């Protein structure tokens, strides 16, 4: 969203410009979420995390407490990586930083029953449905093996950092924590 708001024609290459775009885009994103949830008489809260929430027991504990309080207050937490300070997602050479993985980590932290990841594809296909008309939708995956991982290869959007492979990696994190996961459009 920040790329578009700043009038840039393509995804930035430098980390500092990506951070600036993230700072602009995050505010716009929250305005949209606030408006949408307000229509359902719900309050949305912005929770920006960095991946050190996994490595620091204190930060993890604080994050869990925040999520628990928000949920007790019937507030919908809108979670995103804090891309203005956490640059893993912005550095194309790093593969760990993406919102799919972050969502699975959060679902695991709060012991969620279900994680739903939204995407522009209906779910996992035998091949990339954007380029292969004969690709078939896989409705249920019981186990993530090498065959499933190979199906997850493929393109991502021009502005995205994920793709189906990050969703499959997120599914592994979620299911290892007894959280079911759905990939839907």
Where are these regions (language model features)?
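Nucleotide/pyrophosphate-binding catalytic subdomain
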Residues: 1-180
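Conserved glycine-bearing catalytic or ligand-binding loops at nucleotide- and phosphate-handling centers
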Residues: 182-184
């Amino acid at each position: 969203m920040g790329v578009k708001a700043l009038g840039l024609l393509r995804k930035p290459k430098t980390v500092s410009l990506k951070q600036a775009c993230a700072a602009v885009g995050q505010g716009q994103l929250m305005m949209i979420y606030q408006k949408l949830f307000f229509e359902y008489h719900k309050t949305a809260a912005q929770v920006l995390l960095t991946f050190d929430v996994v490595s620091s027991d204190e930060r993890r504990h604080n994050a869990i407490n925040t999520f628990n309080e928000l949920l007790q207050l019937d507030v919908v937490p809108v979670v995103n990586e804090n891309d203005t300070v956490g640059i893993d997602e912005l550095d194309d050479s790093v593969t760990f930083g993406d919102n799919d993985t972050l969502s699975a980590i959060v679902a695991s932290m709060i012991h969620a029953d279900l994680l739903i990841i939204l995407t522009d594809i209906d779910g996992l296909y035998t091949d990339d449905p954007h380029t292969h008309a004969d690709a078939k939708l896989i409705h249920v995956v019981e186990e993530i093996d090498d065959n499933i991982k190979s199906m997850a290869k493929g393109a991502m959007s021009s502005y995205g950092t994920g793709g189906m492979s990050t969703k499959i990696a997120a599914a592994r994190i979620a299911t290892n924590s007894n959280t079911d996961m759905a990939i839907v459009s």
